[in-house]
């Protein structure tokens, strides 16, 4: 009975997780990541189900997408995981504070970034580490080789992956991305990628990684086709938010 109730509750919240025509974006046309090669990756879960990715930026802080949290939810962060079916090397940690960007706009995707302060500090080891962030206003050139990872769907309307998947992507020219997405796209806040592989549903909140630095947060893509060449995946640029991230964690107890 409880399983049925949980599934019904999850179904009722899915519209919030895919809040517009451009849904939140597992990895398509990718490969299984080498176990624990991305120790900063976390699975964000609700009632034991993976709903988003995130990444450690300190021993007590996770960065993810703002749309990954509905205010009625109590989320759990799983660190140190590769296969979500296995508990070895992983740890489940509660969230103490949910801090969506104050200017987050659910309808237009703007400022779709959120900090999670954990209830306890993670234990740093070979399976759990944080990833560096860019400097203020630091940008990445078009065509730069980067990568994405997650436990989301393996194809459009397909199953989610139990094991962490990854794919290489390239940074798209900003003007081209703006042309594809129109007013939905903000050149100041966002960036796009292109490539054979890419993000899909339930990869939201994971990092776009370039040169071992997290430079973006997976935000949205085409709801009809994962990793669509016509509507490329969009990421929130982290560099403009560095002052907010630092200021927020100075003020959070």
Question: What does each model-identified segment do?
Answer:
Residues 99-105, 121-164:
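Active-site substrate-binding loop(s) of clan PA
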Residues 1-63, 75-81, 86:
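Protease-domain processing segments flanking chymotrypsin-fold serine proteases, especially trypsin-like
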Residues 76-86, 132-138, 168-174:
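Short edge-strand/loop segments of extracellular domains
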Residues 28-29, 78-123, 136, 182:
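Conserved catalytic-core segment of clan PA serine endopeptidases
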Residues 33-37, 56, 69-70, 87, ...:
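Extracellular/periplasmic catalytic domains that process cell-envelope and extracellular macromolecules
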Residues 3-36, 122-130, 137-144, 176-179, ...:
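Extracellular/luminal ectodomains of metazoan preproproteins built from arrays
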Residues 41, 45, 144-253:
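Extracellular trypsin-like serine protease catalytic domains
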Residues 37-39, 72-74, 90-93, 111-113, ...:
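Extracytoplasmic
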């Amino acid at each position: 009975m409880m399983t049925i109730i949980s599934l019904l509750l999850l179904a009722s919240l899915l519209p919030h997780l895919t809040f517009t025509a451009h849904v939140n974006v597992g990895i398509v046309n990718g490969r299984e990541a080498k176990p624990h090669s991305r120790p900063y990756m976390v699975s964000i879960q609700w009632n034991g189900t993976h709903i988003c990715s995130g990444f450690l930026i300190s021993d007590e802080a996770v960065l993810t997408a703002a749309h990954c949290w509905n205010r009625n939810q109590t989320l759990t962060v799983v660190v140190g995981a590769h296969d979500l079916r296995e508990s070895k090397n992983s740890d489940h940690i509660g969230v103490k504070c949910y801090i969506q960007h104050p200017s987050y706009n659910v309808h237009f995707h703007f400022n779709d970034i959120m900090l999670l302060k954990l209830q306890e500090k993670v234990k740093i080891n070979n399976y759990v580490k944080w990833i560096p962030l860019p400097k203020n206003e630091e940008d990445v050139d078009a065509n730069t080789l980067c990568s994405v990872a997650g436990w989301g769907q393996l194809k459009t309307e397909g199953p989610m992956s139990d094991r962490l998947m990854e794919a290489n992507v390239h940074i798209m020219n900003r003007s081209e991305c703006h042309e594809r997405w129109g007013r939905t796209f903000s050149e100041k806040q966002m960036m796009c990628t292109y490539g054979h592989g890419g993000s899909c549903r339930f990869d939201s909140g994971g990092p776009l990684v370039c040169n071992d630095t997290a430079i973006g947060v997976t935000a949205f893509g085409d709801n009809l086709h994962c990793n669509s060449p016509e509507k490329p995946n969009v990421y929130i640029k982290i560099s403009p938010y560095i002052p907010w991230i630092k200021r927020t964690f100075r003020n959070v107890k």
